[in-house]
UniProtKB/Swiss-Prot annotation:
Family: Belongs to the class-I aminoacyl-tRNA synthetase family. IleS type 1 subfamily.
Necessary cofactors: Zn(2+)
Subunit structure: Monomer.
Organism: Staphylococcus aureus (strain MSSA476)
Cellular location(s): Cytoplasm
Keywords, in A-Z order: Aminoacyl-tRNA synthetase, ATP-binding, Cytoplasm, Ligase, Metal-binding, Nucleotide-binding, Protein biosynthesis, Zinc
Enzyme class: ligase
Protein name as annotated: Isoleucine--tRNA ligase
GO biological processes: isoleucyl-tRNA aminoacylation
Residues reported to bind ATP: 598
Binding-site residues, Zn(2+): 886, 889, 906, 909
GO molecular function term, any single one: aminoacyl-tRNA deacylase activity
Name of encoding gene: ileS
Residues that hold L-isoleucyl-5'-AMP according to the record: 554
Lineage of the organism: Bacteria, Bacillati, Bacillota, Bacilli, Bacillales
Length: 917
C-alpha cells in the first residue's frame, strides 16, 4: 500500500484556471435558455418590491468603461435585492432621439436633402435600433441581468405618447410657454446650431471700453460716477439692458482727471494700462462689494433706456473691467442672469444677421458691419474710452466656416420658477447616500433658469402645438391628448406625414382660424424631456414596475441631466420625486487619474477587458473602486484585480476539493458538538456575513472587496485551511474531528458563494454547479445567508489566541532563519506566562495546540528560563521536535510504528491506516 492511497486528498472538477473569456458565454447561454431573469422574479412574486429604474444610455456608439461601471453597479444592487427576497424587476432602457444620431447618418452618407423629413426620421429610427442591439449584446456580456428582450426605448409609440401627456399636463398648469432665448445662430446658413456644430477659429474683432453714466445712484455711488464695460462685440451695445458685477468682488470708484470710474479693483492696473491713464493721477475714492452695487441704475450711452446693475457669478477678473456689458438677447450667461432679474430679451437681428427695424438707426446693416457705426456713435456721445483690435478664438459654423453669433430666437420653455419650490421640497424628502449629492442637485435646481425644451432639429418628439391663421397658439387638453393618442397608435412620425388639420381632433374649430386652416409647430422637444418622462413612460406604464422608483443611480453628470429633468417633470405633474433614493458615481479615468483619450493611448474599453480577462474581472474591478468619486483603471490595476480574483478562486476550489465526500444531510455535526476551533470559524463566518450584508445594504462594495480578501487571507489561508490540511487529509474519513471541520467548511463555501454572487456572477455560478447537495439549481435563485447573532465571548477568546499564534509564528520564523528548523512541523514549541500575559492559564482550555500551531509538539509551562524570547502573549522557545518524522503526516513522534509494509507511522496514522487495511 502506498502512503498516498491512505490520504484523503482534495478532489474537484472545478478548474484552477478561470478561463473566463470562454466560459462566461456558456454560462450566460444556460441562463438565457432557462430564462433565469423571469425565474428569479417568479420566485419572489408577491414579496416586497424593489425598483431600480435604469437611466437610459444614448443609443449611439460602443460602450465605454463608464457604461460598464454604471450597469455593473446596478446589477450588484438588483441581484442582491433579489437574493434578499425582493421582487426586483430590472428594465433596461435606451435614449434614442437627438443630434448625434442625425450626425451619424450624415457621416454614413445619408443625404437628407434627397428625402422627406419623415423618411429621414425613419432612417434615424433604424440606426438607433441597430445601435441598441449592439449595446444590448455588450451589456449582457458583462453579466448584467434584466429584461433585455423587452427594454424600454424612448422612440416606442407608447413612450412618446406618455411624454406628450406629461407635456399636456404641464401646459394645462401654465408651465409651458413660448419666449425668446439666445442660441448659437449661423447667419451664413440661416439656422440655429447645436454646440456640436461649432468649431473655433481665430477672428479679428474690435475691442472697446465704454462708459455708462450713473442715472440713479441709490445712495450707494456718486451721482456723477460712470461704470466702464469692455466688449469685443460692439454691435450688441444696442441690446444692452444691464451691467453685471460679481457680488463678492471688490470694486473701486477711481478719480481720473476729475472723472469718476467704477471698475473691479483687481483689474485697475490692467484697465489703467489699456486706457493710457497716468497712474500718478489715479485716486481710489470709494470701495464697494459687487453686492452693494446691485440695483444701482446706469444710463444706456445712446438710447433712451436704463441699464440696471445686477449680480452674476459668471463675472471673472481674467480680462475686462469686472463690469460686464449684459445683453440677454445675445449671450447665454447674460440670458441666464437676466432671467433672475426679469430683464427684457432684445435681439434686433434677423436670420441673415441683419439689423431689423427694432435696431433703429442700424436697420438694414449686417451685424459685423454695424460694429463701426456703433463705435462711431459711441465716440460722438463721448462714451467710447478706447477702441482697439484683437485676434481671438471665436465660434464658427462647422459647415460654412463663417462666424456665428448668439441670437435670441423664439423657443418653448418649461417654467422652473413656478415649480422650483415644489422641486426643492421634493429633494428634501428624497434620500441620498451622501449629503453632497443632495446639496448638488438642490443648488442646481435653486440656481437654474427656465428650461428651454424646444430644439430646431427633426429627430425627436414633436412639440404638440398648433397655430391658428392669426398666429394664436393652440395647445389645449383636447388637442394635446388627441396627438398623444395618435402617437400611441402610429408613433410620432405621423406628425411629419400628415397635415396639421389631420392631426387635430375631427371637426376641430378655432376662432383664430375662420377659414379652418392650421399650421403645426416644427420644433422638437429637448432629449432631456424624452428621458425625463421615463417615470410616466416606464414606471407607471409597465405592470411589473411602480412609481415612484426606489432608486435612480447614474453618473455624477446627471445631477444636471436626467436626475434634474426627471424630478422636474414628475413634481410638475405628480407632485412628488420619481425616486425615493438617489445615488451617483464618478467618471472612469486612467491609472494616473487622467481622462482617457485616443491621443494619449490610455483608453480601456469593456470589450477589451471582457475578451482578455473576463466579465467577472471587470465586475471585481468595479467592486474595488470608491465609485462615489472618479475611479481609475489601467492594465496594472486590472492585473492586481486578476491576482485578487485568482486568490478568491483558488480558496473556493480548495474548499470544494475538501467537501467532495461530505453530505450535509447525513454528515453534518450539530453546532453544540463542533470542535471549538470550528465554532470559532462559524462565528467568524457569521460576523463576515453580517458585515457583508450591511455593506450591500449601504452600497459599500469597496468594503466587501476588502473584507472578502481579509477573510480569505487572514482567517482561511493563513489559519483555518492551513490548519485543516492535517485534519482533512490525515484523519479518518468519518472521524468527528474531520466531519466537524467539513460541516463548517461546507457552510463557509455555500455562504461565501452566495455573498459573492452579485459581484462574481459567473464564478459563483460555476462554484455552485460544483458544490454537492445544494438545493437550488442556480446560486442566483438562492437566498442570501441570514444574519445570525454571534458568540462574542468565543470570538474574543479566539482573537486573543490568534494574537498568541502570531507570536508563535514570529518565533518560528526566527528559528527558521537561525536554522534550528526548516518546516514548522520540525518544531517543538514551549510557551510560558510572562509579565504581559498569563499564557499557561489561557491555554488550558485549548486542545490539540500542535495542530493549531501546525507544529509537532507543544508544551505549556508556568515559567521559562532566560533563554526564552519574551513576546506580547508569553515567553516562547522553539526547539527541534523530538523523535522522528511520520512518513504519512510528517509530524514528529517518539512512538513511530508500522502497519503492513508501511513503516515510520505515528500512533494516529497507525490507527487510521489499520482501519483501511
Amino acid at each position: 500500500m502506498d502512503y498516498k492511497e491512505t490520504l484523503l486528498m482534495p478532489k474537484t472538477d472545478f478548474p484552477m484556471r478561470g478561463g473566463l473569456p470562454n466560459k462566461e458565454p456558456q454560462i450566460q447561454e444556460k441562463w438565457d435558455a432557462e430564462d433565469q431573469y423571469h425565474k428569479a422574479l417568479e420566485k419572489n412574486k408577491g414579496n416586497e418590491t424593489f425598483i431600480l429604474h435604469d437611466g437610459p444610455p444614448y443609443a449611439n456608439g460602443n460602450l465605454h468603461m463608464g457604461h460598464a461601471l454604471n450597469k455593473i453597479l446596478k446589477d450588484f444592487i438588483v441581484r442582491y435585492k433579489t437574493m434578499q427576497g425582493f421582487y426586483a424587476p430590472y428594465v433596461p432602457g435606451w435614449d434614442t432621439h437627438g443630434l448625434p444620431i442625425e450626425q451619424a447618418l450624415t457621416k454614413k452618407g445619408v443625404d437628407r436633402k434627397k428625402m422627406s423629413t419623415a423618411e429621414f426620421r425613419e432612417k434615424c429610427k433604424e440606426f438607433a435600433l441597430e445601435q441598441i442591439e449592439l449595446q444590448k449584446k455588450d451589456f449582457r456580456r458583462l453579466g448584467v441581468r434584466g429584461d433585455f428582450n423587452d427594454p424600454y426605448i424612448t422612440l416606442k409609440p407608447e413612450y412618446e405618447a406618455a411624454q406628450i401627456r406629461i407635456f399636456g399636463e404641464m401646459a394645462d398648469k401654465g408651465l409651458i410657454y413660448k419666449g425668446k432665448k439666445p442660441v448659437y445662430w449661423s447667419p451664413s446658413s440661416e439656422s440655429s446650431l447645436a454646440e456640436a456644430e461649432i468649431e473655433y477659429h481665430d477672428k479679428r474683432s474690435a475691442s472697446i471700453y465704454v462708459a455708462f453714466d450713473v442715472k440713479d445712484d441709490k445712495g450707494v455711488v456718486d451721482a456723477d460716477a460712470k461704470f466702464i464695460i469692455w466688449t469685443t462685440t460692439p454691435w450688441t451695445i444696442p441690446s444692452n439692458v444691464a451691467i453685471t458685477v460679481h457680488p463678492e468682488l471688490k470694486y473701486g470708484q477711481y478719480n481720473v482727471d476729475g472723472e469718476k470710474y467704477i471698475i473691479a479693483e483687481a483689474l485697475s492696473d490692467a484697465v489703467a494700462e489699456a486706457l493710457d491713464w497716468d497712474k500718478a493721477s489715479i485716486k481710489l475714492e470709494k470701495e464697494y462689494t459687487g453686492k452693494e452695487l446691485e440695483y444701482v441704475v446706469a444710463q444706456h450711452p445712446f438710447l433712451d433706456r436704463e441699464s440696471l446693475v445686477i449680480n452674476g457669478d459668471h463675472v471673472t477678473t481674467d480680462a475686462g473691467t469686472g463690469c460686464v456689458h449684459t445683453a440677454p438677447g445675445h449671450g447665454e450667461d447674460d440670458y441666464i442672469v437676466g432671467q433672475k432679474y426679469e430683464l427684457p430679451v432684445i435681439s434686433p437681428i434677423d436670420d441673415k444677421g441683419v439689423f431689423t427695424e427694432e435696431g433703429g438707426q442700424f436697420e438694414g446693416m449686417f451685424y459685423d458691419k454695424a460694429n463701426k457705426a456703433v463705435t462711431d456713435l459711441l465716440t460722438e456721445k463721448g462714451a467710447l474710452l478706447k477702441l482697439d483690435f484683437i485676434t481671438h478664438s471665436y465660434p464658427h459654423d462647422w459647415r460654412t466656416k463663417k462666424p456665428v453669433i448668439f441670437r435670441a430666437t423664439p423657443q418653448w420653455f418649461a417654467s422652473i420658477s413656478k415649480v422650483r419650490q415644489d422641486i426643492l421640497d421634493a429633494i428634501e424628502n428624497t434620500n441620498f447616500k451622501v449629503n453632497w449629492g443632495k446639496t448638488r442637485i438642490y443648488n442646481m435646481v435653486r440656481d437654474r433658469g427656465e428650461w428651454v425644451i424646444s430644439r430646431q432639429r427633426v429627430w425627436g418628439v414633436p412639440l404638440p402645438v398648433f397655430y391658428a391663421e392669426n398666429g394664436e397658439i393652440i395647445m389645449t387638453k383636447e388637442t394635446v391628448n388627441h396627438v398623444a393618442d395618435l402617437f400611441a397608435e402610429h408613433g410620432s412620425n405621423i406628425w411629419f406625414e400628415r397635415e396639421a388639420k389631420d392631426l387635430l381632433p375631427e371637426g376641430f374649430t378655432h376662432p383664430g382660424s375662420p377659414n379652418g386652416t392650421f399650421t403645426k409647430e416644427t420644433d422638437i422637444m429637448d432629449v432631456w424631456f424624452d428621458s425625463g418622462s421615463s417615470h410616466r413612460g416606464v414606471l407607471e406604464t409597465r405592470p411589473e414596475l411602480s412609481f415612484p422608483a426606489d432608486m435612480y443611480l447614474e453618473g455624477s453628470d446627471q445631477y444636471r441631466g436626467w436626475f434634474n429633468s426627471s424630478i422636474t417633470t414628475s413634481v410638475a405633474t405628480r407632485g412628488v420625486s420619481p425616486y425615493k433614493f438617489l445615488l451617483s458615481h464618478g467618471f472612469v479615468m486612467d491609472g494616473e487619474g487622467k481622462k482617457m483619450s485616443k491621443s494619449l493611448g490610455n483608453v480601456i474599453v469593456p470589450d477589451q477587458v471582457v475578451k482578455q480577462k473576463g466579465a467577472d474581472i471587470a465586475r471585481l474591478w468595479v467592486s474595488s473602486t470608491d465609485y462615489l468619486a472618479d475611479v481609475r483603471i489601467s492594465d496594472e490595476i486590472l492585473k492586481q484585480t486578476s491576482d485578487v480574483y485568482r486568490k478568491i478562486r483558488n480558496t473556493l476550489r480548495f474548499m470544494l476539493g475538501n467537501i467532495n465526500d461530505f453530505n450535509p444531510d447525513t454528515d453534518s455535526i450539530t453546532e453544540s458538538e463542533l470542535l471549538e476551533v470550528d465554532r470559532y470559524l462559524l462565528n467568524r463566518l457569521r460576523e463576515f456575513t453580517a458585515s457583508t450584508i450591511n455593506n450591500y445594504e449601504n452600497f459599500d462594495y469597496l468594503n466587501i472587496y476588502q473584507e472578502v480578501q481579509n477573510f480569505i487571507n487572514v482567517e482561511l489561508s493563513n489559519f483555518y485551511l492551513d490548519y485543516g490540511k492535517d485534519i482533512l487529509y490525515i484523519e479518518q474519513r468519518d472521524s468527528h474531528i474531520r466531519r466537524s471541520m467539513q460541516t463548517v467548511l461546507y457552510q463557509i463555501l455555500v455562504d461565501m458563494t452566495k455573498l459573492l454572487a452579485p459581484i462574481l456572477v459567473h464564478t459563483a455560478e460555476e462554484v455552485w454547479s460544483h458544490t454537492p447537495h445544494v438545493k437550488e439549481e442556480s446560486v442566483h435563485l438562492a437566498d442570501m445567508p441570514k444574519v445570525v447573532e454571534v458568540d462574542q465571548a468565543l470570538l474574543d477568546k479566539w482573537r486573543t489566541f490568534m494574537n498568541l499564534r502570531d507570536d508563535v509564528n514570529r518565533a518560528l520564523e526566527t528559528a527558521r532563519n537561525e536554522k534550528v528548523i526548516g518546516k514548522s512541523l520540525e518544531a517543538k514549541v514551549t510557551i510560558a506566562s510572562n509579565d504581559k500575559f498569563n499564557a499557561s492559564e489561557f491555554l488550558t482550555s485549548f486542545d490539540a495546540l500542535h495542530q493549531l500551531f501546525i507544529v509537532s509538539q507543544v508544551k505549556v509551562v508556568d515559567k521559562l528560563d532566560d533563554q526564552a524570547t519574551a513576546y506580547e502573549h508569553g515567553d516562547i522557545v522553539i526547539e527541534h521536535a523530538d523523535g522522528e518524522k511520520c512518513e504519512r503526516c510528517w509530524n514528529y513522534s517518539e512512538d513511530l510504528g508500522a502497519v503492513d509494509e508501511l513503516t515510520h507511522l505515528c500512533p494516529r496514522c497507525q490507527q487510521v491506516v489499520k482501519s483501511l487495511v
